């Protein structure tokens, strides 16, 4: 609960007998490699400690970037801010955050968003 099952270990944990639902007929189809939602993935793999650390890191970075954007009106920074915000919306399903192409794009946009903080 506090520390999760470890990065990319969701697929191993979900196959354990203790999570098996005997009322569900096709139990083989319940196995998946990741939770398909970034918040659930962080909670299950890094626990409540890792989740809150991630959220604080992202939102404090967003706060600084928005504050910087309001001073400079840099459109590159704005595009990074918008991408990061839409990527962490809880209503949007996502691929595995730790091992997909989309997570690479997320971190590139995060770097663009934060890269213009030094210019102020």
Regions found by a protein language model. Name each.
Residues 1-46:
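Long extracytoplasmic/lumenal interhelical loops at the membrane interface
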Residues 7-11, 50-53, 97-98, 114:
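Short, flexible micro-motifs
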Residues 45-88:
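Hydrophobic transmembrane alpha-helices and their immediate junctions
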Residues 3-5, 46-49, 93, 110:
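Short glycine-rich loop/turn motifs that provide flexible caps or phosphate-binding loops at active sites
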Residues 14-15, 19-23, 60-65, 108-109, ...:
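A short hydrophobic/aromatic micro-motif that marks alpha-helical segments and, especially, helix-coil
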């Amino acid at each position: 609960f506090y520390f999760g099952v470890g990065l990319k270990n969701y697929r191993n944990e979900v196959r354990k007998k203790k999570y098996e639902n005997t009322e569900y007929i096709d139990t083989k189809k319940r196995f998946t490699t990741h939770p398909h939602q970034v918040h659930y993935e962080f909670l299950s793999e890094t626990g409540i400690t890792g989740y809150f650390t991630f959220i604080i890191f992202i939102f404090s970075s967003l706060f600084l970037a928005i504050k910087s954007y309001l001073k400079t009106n840099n459109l590159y920074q704005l595009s990074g801010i918008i991408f990061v915000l839409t990527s962490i919306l809880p209503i949007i399903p996502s691929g595995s955050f730790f091992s997909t192409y989309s997570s690479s794009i997320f971190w590139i946009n995060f770097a663009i968003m934060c890269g213009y903080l030094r210019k102020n």
